[in-house]
Amino acid sequence: MKKTMSLSALLAMTFGSSLLMAADLPADLNWQSNLHEPRFASPQAKFGGTFHTYIESFPQTFRVVGPDSNGRFRPWLLDSRPSAVTRHPDTKAWIPDIASEWAYGDDNKTVYFRINPNAKWSDGEPITSEDFTFVLTFMRSKDIVAPWYNTFYTQQIEDVIQYDERTFAVVSGEKRNAEELMLYTNMRPIPAHFYRPKKDENHDGIQDNFVRFYNFKPEPSAGPYYVDDMKKGKSITFKHVGKDWWGYSNPYYLHRYNVEKIRIKVIRDKDIARQHFEKGNLDSFWLDTPELWREKTETANFEQGYIHKFWGYNQVPIGAGGLWLNTAKPLLDQLEVRKGIALATDFDGLIEKVLRGDVVRKPNPMGIGHGDYTNADIKAPSFDPAKAIAHFEKAGFSQIGPDGIRVNEQGQRLSFGITYSYGYLTPQIAYLKEQAKLAGLEFTLNLIDGSSAFKYVLEKKHELSFHSMGTAEIPAYWEYFHSTNANKPQNNNFTNFSTPELDRLIMAYRTEFDLEKKKVHAKQIQAIVADAGVIVPGYMRPYAREAFWRWLQIPQPAMTKSTEFLFPSGTFRDLGTYWIDESLKKETKAAMKSGKSFAPVTILEEEYKL
């Protein structure tokens, strides 16, 4: 029989930490550490160097909760920050993160965790059980002005129990099957020492003017990087804790997060950013459009092998998205109008003619890739102007104005603005606008700067919004369609749509223990949303597609099932498996000066292509 040693036991032997359990900790727990999943980083990785990238707008806050926090910069502050445990990117098994061991209680509600004894915040303070119990104090406080978190951590998390400095338990508010219990109880710690209030007149343990006080005060990081420098409106620099970062005592972190600094410059125009990339001022660039992958890479730097191209497929679950219709706005509360809009929106033509078939139509407005939770019977509506016109006429839009746009008897034009956040999307929205005219529908273009656009949508000011959301393994519906969030700002019910039947199903879905029944509820919810026509399904990219200078090195193969980005190209959602080879950087710079060239490189990885 193969003998194994848990990570906690190994660390205790190495560092002399005591692992004696508190007296009231259940004695019969089956502790797990799961150290035998395959590694996905390269032992050849080298530490050091500065990675240069860009964002199009400066964040409105460094908070990760409260007003304006759910913006495009948020992944930089969350996605590299560890939780108690994490999923292996290929096998999806739970593996250690901050916790070196975990155990399930026999009540179907409780999960116990032991913290890695080396775990520290970036400011040097140890990560303790208090940082997990503090999560409830923080997330339940009204001072953070985050109703969704207030509700979730009150209703879905019953308690967090501290046994000693390294041992704690999280108790779910409901009994849950093993598949989702860890998803609910797996927490990201919050540094209690950092948030100790200076003014707390309501005695809830949180700074009274939290939103303003912490707006640009980034919290210490449990991950490899922390905010080191900030020039408002211009740049942000993340710095690595160093080679002695506690995470490297976890074997799954070895050879990852290798660069010493990540410098992010604000460049408000994508074309200008691409020019900076071609000059070597940025290290990688996301090739999300057909032109960027094709014509824009037909330059000397690519042809002479200085810059490489990569296209690798993944199997990441896809979240809800496309055109979100705000039913609180005039006319959009009418089902016939919404059905007409769906049939007059030519996403299929957009994919074929503008995006050259590089992307795939999203069949389900609530996303796909959730296994048996996904309602495979739902199909995206095909472009059909004649059918769209029939719906518009049922809604009273039987007349056509001199500009070709339909009007009703009250003189209202069939016209709606599409809010979107990036200039490179303008040709796509313009195509939808031209095609919609065939049904007498007008789309106007409402381009708003990146972070401001999401704030605009969160405040429910939009008519139609073109955006997509991320998702978890088990899909969520409460935030999008429960009546609690309808017609209120700063939450994710972007459509302001809800019904009593949806409320009932959503609550049944949230509390259902039986997996098969839960999946039935999920499919019913998706069917109601699809029939309501409040989201016109957009498109999806099941791959990572980037360009990078040849001094950036990647594992072979580079892709896992969960790889969305190879590099932090404008967002921090990569797995940190790349590194900078300074000798290759010098070689490349010298070659460019002397005129020496290398073979052009295009890498295609299709192992996870569906």
PLM regions and their residue ranges:
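Extracellular/periplasmic solute-recognition and catalytic clefts
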Residues: M139-K142, A146, D228-K239, K265-K329, ...
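Gly/Pro-rich hinge or "lid" segments in bacterial periplasmic/extracellular proteins
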Residues: R81, T86-A93, M187-K261, D271, ...
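Alpha-helical secondary-structure segments
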Residues: H52, T128-T137, E165-V171, G223-P224, ...
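Surface-exposed binding/hinge segments that line
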Residues: K46, N150-D204, P224, D229-K231
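Detector for C-terminal structural segments
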Residues: A27-D28, Q32-H36, I55, K231-H240, ...
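Aromatic- and charge-enriched surface segment that lines or borders ligand/interaction sites
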Residues: S100-V145, A169, A273-H276, L331-D333
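N-terminal lobe/hinge region of extracytoplasmic solute-binding protein
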Residues: L25-R39, F47-D106, T137, P220, ...
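Ligand-site clamp/hinge motif
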Residues: N116, F213-F216, D244-E298, K433, ...
